[in-house]
């Protein structure tokens, strides 16, 4: 993967001196996450690191399209295990046969979704009615690094613009814009992210990252 990055920073420190983890190192850490530089990432995150994703409304599962159905590969919250489990297959969603584009679960918390599924190891079709819930997915360091590698493999090149960064004690608020292309001279895709990085007591490692609710998560609840 090739990458370029542009940094326009309005940085404010409320300390008399910069923390051990310098501004440039924080920038490099963000770039490393998207370039697939797992060595840099591993050097920057602390033992027991957690990445807390932006909250979203949905079914709380990850699924991939395989042979005409969506195979569930991960369940975010144990409470949904009463409905869906890893290995189950979704065949229909709200009366429509699923396809490789996945399913659109836009709606408010509590809105019911009707699914036709087969349970893992069973060929019997069942109809389930599952309400949408608010979920917040957490990743440990191993899962975080694995996801970095998968994501970097998807893109031919990318660019990160850090719009604003605020440092206060052991917290770093950062707002950045990502854009990238999957192919040379291909279409460009964009997203904007706001995150809080929590540093350890020495302020030289990142212990936790929290995604912040955005307008997109709010708008996605509407049909």
For the regions a language model picked out, list residue spans one by one.
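Low-complexity, intrinsically disordered terminal/linker segments enriched in charged
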Residues: 138, 146, 150, 208-223
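PDZ/PDZ-like peptide-tail recognition elements
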Residues: 18-74, 103-106
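Short, solvent-exposed coil/turn segments at beta-strand boundaries
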Residues: 43-48, 66-67, 167-171, 197-207
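Hydrophobic/aromatic beta-strand elements that line small-molecule binding cavities or substrate pockets
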Residues: 160-166, 192-199
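PDZ-domain C-terminal substructure recognizer with occasional recognition of PDZ-binding tails
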Residues: 103-142
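Bacterial Sec-dependent N-terminal signal peptides
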Residues: 1-20
């Amino acid at each position: 993967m090739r990458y370029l990055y542009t940094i326009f920073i309005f940085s404010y420190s409320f300390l008399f001196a910069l923390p051990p983890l310098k501004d440039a190192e924080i920038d490099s850490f963000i770039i490393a996450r998207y370039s697939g530089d797992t060595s840099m990432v591993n050097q920057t995150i602390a033992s027991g690191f957690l990445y807390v994703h932006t909250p979203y409304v949905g079914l709380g599962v990850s699924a991939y399209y395989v042979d005409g159905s969506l195979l569930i590969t991960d369940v975010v919250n144990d409470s949904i295990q009463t409905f869906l489990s890893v290995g189950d297959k979704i065949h229909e969603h709200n009366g429509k046969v699923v396809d490789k584009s996945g399913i659109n679960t836009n709606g408010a918390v509590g809105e019911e979704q009707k699914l036709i599924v087969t349970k893992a190891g069973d060929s019997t079709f069942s109809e389930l009615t599952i309400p949408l819930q608010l979920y917040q997915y957490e990743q440990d360091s191993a899962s975080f690094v694995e996801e970095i590698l998968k994501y970097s493999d998807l893109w031919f090149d990318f660019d990160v613009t850090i719009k604003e960064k605020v440092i206060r004690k052991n917290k770093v608020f950062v707002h950045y814009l990502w854009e990238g292309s999957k192919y040379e001279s291909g279409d460009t895709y964009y997203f904007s992210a706001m995150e809080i990085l929590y540093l350890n007591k020495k302020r030289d490692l990142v212990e936790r990252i929290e995604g912040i609710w955005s307008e997109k998560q709010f708008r996605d609840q509407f049909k």
